[in-house]
Amino acid sequence: MWLSPSLLLLILPGYSIAAKITGPTTVNGSEQGSLTVQCAYGSGWETYLKWRCQGADWNYCNILVKTNGSEQEVKKNRVSIRDNQKNHVFTVTMENLKRDDADSYWCGTERPGIDLGVKVQVTINPGTQTAVSEWTTTTASLAFTAAATQKTSSPLTRSPLKSTHFLFLFLLELPLLLSMLGTVLWVNRPQRRS
């Protein structure tokens, strides 16, 4: 059976645009200070939701803050997030840092199918200074200020079975595909001759 490209787009949502997300591997902050991390994403994902979550396990991390699809800043408790869609960078700021904020965090982009994300290890030092991880564009490479290690994490993808979008699309598309298959089989059934 031949499937049209438009049908393949229905079957494989979120796979039609190549995407990648990058950010610093480690960032240091000081107790009672603030910490800013910038994560970059590929073209085509400007209006998708961006998020920051906490926890070493990608599939079970706790989402702290999420954008609303615009460039408007969203703040929840001590964490804020702002998406610069023109530059394909979103910025997450944590304020009034505590020692127990030291943990693994993830910058992520919510999309149909599989979310994209990159792990950022945060360490908190005693003291009261502000740490900033900043992107500088220089000849297609990314550089960070001294507050962050000068390398990027490799992106990970979230399991599609953990994504509510995937489950919703699966439950929506499955009956459609089954009815299409039934129609094709019914049209191509052998005809009885009298």
UniProtKB/Swiss-Prot annotation:
Detail the disulphide connectivity of this chain as listed in its UniProt entry: C39-C107
The name this protein carries in UniProt is CMRF35-like molecule 5
Which residues does the annotation flag as glycosylated? N28
Instruction: Please indicate if the UniProt record lists DNA-binding as a keyword.
Output: no
- Regions crossing the membrane: 166-186
Q: Which first-to-last residue range defines the signal peptide?
A: 1-18
A single GO BP: immune response-activating signaling pathway
